[in-house]
Amino acid sequence: MNMALISLAIDYKKSPIEVRSEFALSGLDVSMLYRSILAIDNVVHAVILSTCNRTEVYLEISDLRVVDDILVWWQGYVRNPNYKIKDYFKLRQGTEVIMHLMKLACGLESMVLGEPQILGQVKDSYTLSKKNHAIGKELDRVFQKVFATAKRVRSETRIGHCPVSVAFSAITLAKRQLDNISSKNVLIIGAGQTGELLFRHVTALAPKQIMLANRTIEKAQKITSAFRNASAHYLSELPQLIKKADIIIAAVNVLEYIVTCKYVGDKPRVFIDISIPQALDPKLGELEQNVYYCVDDINAVIEDNKDKRKYESSKAQKIIVKSLEEYLEKEKAIISNSAIKELFQKADGLVDLSLEKSLAKIRNGKDAEEIIKRFAYEIKKKVLHYPVVGMKEASKQGRSDCLVCMKRMFGLNVEK
């Protein structure tokens, strides 16, 4: 059976958080998901990946028309009927799927360029697919090559070491000031796009606690709900939250300072304000125990890393392209070897039956020379039957390229 490799994706590039939340498959019974998707006609194998920034389904299928059935399956898990998957999903096919998965596992498709968490998430998805007997040989080979590629990118580049955004750079500054973030409490003010990105960076550092404060608590709750050490709060709770916090990062739209010196005591804190207009009073930095950074400080970090980022990303891309070429060459060899094996099996089948009949006749006293001549004639006819039919059909269709190919296969003169 000829199978095609495809993927369907909902990700942050096309879909905001509220859309991604609707189409997320995380939190559902994994075994049930695999049973239901594999029950769809023409779906042969599957791997389901669901993270905060994306939900993607990788599939081996026997008919491309099954895509519509898969979309219906996915839509069935959406709580709000106003969200239609056809408005948001991206379809990839063949080599594009493998290239995307390699870039994804290496962190090149992430909100945070080079972030390492995605590789672990891809590995977890692969493991769950195997556990549910949902992965086939070809898809397995794809993922093994992806993991090897990601390992090589990690060892041969510094793609995960260069701050690539205001949010990531802000966290870099915070790390410089505090030795052991795992014992610290972090307060993020604002749950917009930058606030969400800050939250993702902070979770990667595994602090003791993350507090996310926002005007509307619902948005903050959507972001924090999947994390045990995270909590959502109203902006009105800031005085109490600041007392607990060791690091305060603001990314919020306000017209006046929402954190001033009156909120803080003698406890040392790191204040990082990436809001415009500023949300944290710069005078906080004048207090001896505090460290204060604003957008200009962060931009300096970004500027320092521009060339590094470009260079490391370019190195990673070259490794991925090379790795994809290696994979495709190996797949060609596998397909070729499989075809050769099948050809020999076919030949064995043609020869064995005729040979046994011929030997039986010789054992029964028939003329051996005549039997061997007849055997050779029958084998010649059987072996050449399908090639002759193929050549006639190619000639009818004007496929001179096929004729040339078949001539080469049989060592014939292609010039005639």
Swiss-Prot record:
Q: What is its EC number?
A: 1.2.1.70
One Pfam family per UniProt:
GlutR_dimer
- What CDD domains does this protein map onto? NAD_bind_Glutamyl_tRNA_reduct
| Coiled-coil segments | none
Does this entry carry the keyword Ubl conjugation?
Answer: no
Q: Could you say which residues are annotated as the site Important for activity? A: 100
Which reactions does this protein catalyse? (S)-4-amino-5-oxopentanoate + tRNA(Glu) + NADP(+) = L-glutamyl-tRNA(Glu) + NADPH + H(+)
| Keywords, ordered alphabetically | NADP, Oxidoreductase, Porphyrin biosynthesis
Q: In which pathway does it act?
A: Porphyrin-containing compound metabolism; protoporphyrin-IX biosynthesis; 5-aminolevulinate from L-glutamyl-tRNA(Glu): step 1/2
List, in alphabetical order, the Gene Ontology terms for molecular function in this entry.
glutamyl-tRNA reductase activity; NADP binding
Q: Name one GO biological process term.
A: protoporphyrinogen IX biosynthetic process from glutamate
Asked whether the keyword Oxidoreductase is assigned, the reply is yes
Q: Which family does this protein fall into? A: Belongs to the glutamyl-tRNA reductase family.
User: What is the stated purpose of this protein?
Assistant: Catalyzes the NADPH-dependent reduction of glutamyl-tRNA(Glu) to glutamate 1-semialdehyde (GSA).
Domain free text = Possesses an unusual extended V-shaped dimeric structure with each monomer consisting of three distinct domains arranged along a curved 'spinal' alpha-helix. The N-terminal catalytic domain specifically recognizes the glutamate moiety of the substrate. The second domain is the NADPH-binding domain, and the third C-terminal domain is responsible for dimerization.
The name this protein goes by in its record: Glutamyl-tRNA reductase
Q: Report the source organism.
A: Francisella tularensis subsp. tularensis (strain SCHU S4 / Schu 4)
